[in-house]
Every structure is written in C-alpha cells, then in structure tokens.
C-alpha cells in the first residue's frame, strides 16, 4: 500500500492506493469540515457514489473477509484459509500465537472458511446453518449476498474441515427451508 499527503483545492488530504474490495481503489483521509466539499468536487468530476452494499458485494466476490463477520480475534489465519497471508520468512519463526499456527498447519483444523454457492438465487445471510447430506449441522454462513458479476447468490462461512473440498454438496437452512449449495 502506498500513500501520501496531497493538496486538493485549499485543503490537505492523505490518500492511500489500496482497495478493500479486490478492486483498484483509493482511501482518502480528510478533516471532517472539508469532507462534504471534497465529495461535491468528486461528483462534479463524474465520480459515482456507492454504498456499503456495493462494497460488501465486491469483497464477497473477491473472497475477502470482513472483520467481525468472517474473522475475529478468536479466528486463526489457518481456520480462515488465510495461510497465504503469513510471510514465508515469518511462518517458521516464533511470534505470538506461532505455536497454535504451527500445530494447525501440521495437524489441520476442525473448521475452515470456504466459499459457498447456493443452487438457487436465495441469499444465505450470516448465521445461516449449514448441513451435510445426512442433515448434520456442519457449520454456519458468516456473509452472503447476490453477486452481480456471477449473476448468482454467493456466501462464505465455516464448515467442518472434512466438508471443505470443492464441489462438496451441502444444504443451507434459509427461513426454515433447506437450500442445496456447493463449496
């Protein structure tokens, strides 16, 4: 991530080149008293406003976690399927939590975060229960929405590790009905 201080009109802004959604983007930090003026100037230049729903859709299509929904202080990078985010230089060193991480890499985890595609357009939201084909509860959805890029509903959640393979058939309980889905 790169960032810097810039002057826009008569005020200072701090801009970082980043993107929380998987898209190229910028994050702008600005004094509150200039925020409305800044947005008005962007709109004059042709910018389009979006809301949290768009951000959520983009991040889910990209498979990105939302802290508090998909990951939290009790979730390890291995459970969240984020081992790739641990530097290769660091993975074998000692750091807070390294013993747990190393044990999970060696022995596996009980639950793991997966992407899920319901077979219908029904949207499975957070806390939707996930069942196997024998009707045993095996996990929960953490986030779900409609993905316009794939023209289908999408979700992510945690399932017991032995159900995490691609194309594993499972069922989501949405409003009292079981909906077929696949990893």
Residue ranges and their predicted role:
Residues 1-183:
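Conserved, structured C-terminal
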């Amino acid at each position: 991530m790169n960032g810097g201080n810039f002057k826009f009109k008569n005020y200072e802004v701090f801009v970082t080149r980043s993107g929380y959604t998987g898209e190229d983007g910028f994050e702008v930090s600005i004094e509150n008293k200039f925020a409305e003026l800044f947005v008005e100037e962007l709109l004059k230049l042709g910018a389009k406003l979006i809301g949290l729903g768009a951000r959520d859709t983009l991040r889910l299509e990209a498979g990105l976690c939302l802290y508090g929904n998909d990951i939290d202080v009790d979730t390890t990078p291995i459970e969240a399927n984020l081992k790739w985010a641990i530097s290769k230089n660091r993975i074998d060193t000692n750091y807070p939590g390294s013993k747990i991480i190393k044990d999970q890499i060696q022995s596996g985890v009980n639950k793991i975060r997966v992407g899920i595609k319901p077979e219908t357009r029904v949207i499975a939201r957070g806390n939707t229960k996930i069942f196997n084909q024998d009707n045993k509860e095996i996990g929960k959805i953490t986030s779900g929405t409609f993905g316009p890029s794939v023209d289908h509903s999408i979700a992510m959640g945690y399932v017991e590790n032995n159900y995490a393979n691609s194309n594993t058939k499972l069922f989501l309980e949405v409003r009292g009905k079981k909906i077929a889905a696949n990893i």
